[in-house]
Amino acid sequence: MLQKLEFFYLIAFYFLVLGFEVSNFAKLNKENTMAIIITDECINCGACEPECPNNAIYEASDEWKYEEGTELTGLVVLPNGKQVDAAKEQEPISDEFYFIAPDKCTECIGFHEEPQCAAVCPVDCCVPDEDVVETETELLAKKTFMHRD
């Protein structure tokens, strides 16, 4: 018990002295989730695209917009701090297979119990993206931000 308490105080000290924000502490816990990525095993069947409540899934080589499937308009600052023009076409993330725009993916949190793309994918190529780690709270905030509810 004493070691756990000492560890907690050590972590608290680092947060206070080094100026870590509380949101950074959340990234250390085990309740983190990740945006979904479509792997190169994709067979381009398209089953995933209509299932996404955020319109975050696009066909290979398709340009995409932040405003598609959301209530975002004009210049916006995303929850991750990035400023974008919601109406501007974005470059495709993949030229070979379907892709998911990570800034729009909420893992269906706030809509469904599980990511719908993964639920319908016949080859199980919709998997967590380890490069885009977010908490459930962050994903819910992103959903609310995009859909204004």
Could you say what each language-model-derived stretch is?
Residues 37-38:
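Local sequence-structure signature of Cys/Sec-based thiol-disulfide redox active-site neighborhoods
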Residues 10, 15, 27-34, 58-149:
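Flanking helices and flexible, charged tails adjoining ferredoxin-like Fe-S electron-transfer domains
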